[in-house]
Amino acid sequence: MDFVHCNKCFNRKPPDGFFISSCFHIFCTKCAKADLAVCLICKKNVRLVRLDGNISSGIKIYFADPIKMVADSLAKIQKKIDFQQSTRDHLVKYLTKEKEKKRQMEVYFRTKGQEFDSQRKKLAEATAWIQMAEKKLQASEEERVKAEREIEECQAKLKSMTNLMSADTLGMNSQTPFPFSLAESQETAPSLVESSANSTFNMVSPLVSSPASSPNSINYNSFFENGSRTRPESLNEEAMFNTMLQSSGQSANANTSESSAFSVAFNNIFTPSRNNMGDSSMINKTTANQTIMDKTSMSLENWRQNRANSFGVHDISKRDSSLPTGGGSAIRVHHFKQNSRITPIAQNRRSAAGFDRQQIQEMRRISSQPGYLAQRKPINGRSFIGPAD
């Protein structure tokens, strides 16, 4: 420390060392006295301290090397700067992370907000759909109740119709009335319907006497072979009977019993089955019977036209006088007016009634012969039925 000297005598190396006052003036031992109370330089009250190794660090720092002190200070300052920088960097790093988290949270909440809006729209649509479905369910329930009520009504109607049809079926099985109006005849024909509990109906023709005559009573083969020699062309009964039998599913060879062909045909037409017939079988049977009667009407019409061409038109006005009535006849007589609406069969029967008694009896006798329908005989040079199967 070459700069230390006595500020009064300027002695640089005193033997007893130096003193430093509280006003930072240095004095040697010679100049400074132990009882020095006033500074010799600035004249202030001072307190003296010996400069030796026991001085305090506060005083010692003034005698240290300034470069070293600066270096130490710089090092300390650098440490302070480093500490502060590291602390600052740590804070900045934390704030940066928080900022990134904030940005991510903003993106997240923005996305969730969009999803929330979408879910809210879907919820509104689902609510509307539920309301519509509830309305449809209520309407469907009403329709179901209505349909059940209609089904119950239909079942009740069906039950009543079934009971009615069952009653009609029982009535038909018990007795089937003859639907044709009967012409007046001299002789009382047998009963039109003869039935019993264990047999089918036996329909008898009103124009044919039953039982039939013996096959040997008349040569009916020669009658058809040379019919014009004995009498005018008669009724085309063969075509009519075979048409009725073929329509009802019967063969011409079936007429081998004692009953006449006309009786067999009427029996097949109007005899219902003793079994319990269903609605479908009844309808089919009615349709078949109607077809048979239509074909029978056509056969009678052909006979009437043939007879009109051969002998002239029959005078219908003489119907009541052409046949004897017979006072004891139990058959009801139906008088037909010329302008009244009648069925084709009734018209044909009225035309057929124009024959005299002898001709009608002859027709009855011929048509009741066994095997009459099995033979194919031409009448007036024409054949009205096909060959027998």
Swiss-Prot record:
Which effects follow disruption of this gene?
High levels of embryonic lethality, but a small proportion of the surviving progeny develop beyond the L3 larval stage. Of the surviving progeny, there is a high incidence of males (him phenotype). Impaired meiotic recombination with no chiasma formation between homologous chromosome pairs at diplotene and diakinesis. This is most likely due to an absence of crossover recombination. Disrupted rad-51 localization during meiosis, whereby rad-51-positive foci are present in the gonad similarly to wild-type, however unlike in wild-type, they disappear before the end of pachytene.
List the disulfide bonds in this chain. Answer: none
Where are the stretches annotated Disordered?
366-389
Where are the RING-type Zn fingers located?
6-43
Q: Which InterPro entries match?
A: Zip3/RNF212-like (IPR042123), Znf_RING (IPR001841), Znf_RING_CS (IPR017907)
The terms describing its cellular component in GO are:
chromosome; synaptonemal complex
The UniProt entry's coiled-coil ranges are 123-164
Question: What tissues has this protein been observed in?
Answer: Expressed througout the gonad (at protein level). Expressed in the germline.
Q: Which UniProt keywords apply?
A: Chromosome, Coiled coil, DNA recombination, Meiosis, Metal-binding, Zinc, Zinc-finger
The record's principal subcellular location, in a coarse class, is nucleus
Record localization: Chromosome
Q: Which GO terms describe its biological process?
A: chiasma assembly; embryo development ending in birth or egg hatching; homologous chromosome pairing at meiosis; meiotic chromosome segregation; reciprocal meiotic recombination; synaptonemal complex disassembly
User: Which GO terms fall under molecular function for this chain's record?
Assistant: SUMO transferase activity; zinc ion binding
List, alphabetically, the PANTHER family matched: RING FINGER PROTEIN NARYA-RELATED (PTHR22663), ZIP HOMOLOGOUS PROTEIN 3 (PTHR22663:SF28)
What does the function comment of this entry state?
Recruited co-dependently with zhp-4 to the synaptonemal complex between homologous chromosome pairs to regulate the formation and number of crossover events between homologs during meiotic recombination. In the early stages of pachytene, in complex with zhp-4, recruited by the zhp-1-zhp-2 heterodimer to designated crossover sites along the homolog pair to stabilize other pro-crossover factors such as rmh-1, msh-5 and cosa-1. This in turn facilitates crossover and promotes the formation of chiasma in each meiotic nucleus at the late pachytene stage of meiosis.
On subunit structure and binding partners, the annotation says: Interacts with zhp-4; the interaction is required for their localization along paired chromosomes and stability, and for the formation of chiasma during meiotic recombination.
Q: What is this protein called?
A: Zip homologous protein 3
Q: What's the source species for this entry?
A: Caenorhabditis elegans
Encoding gene (name): zhp-3
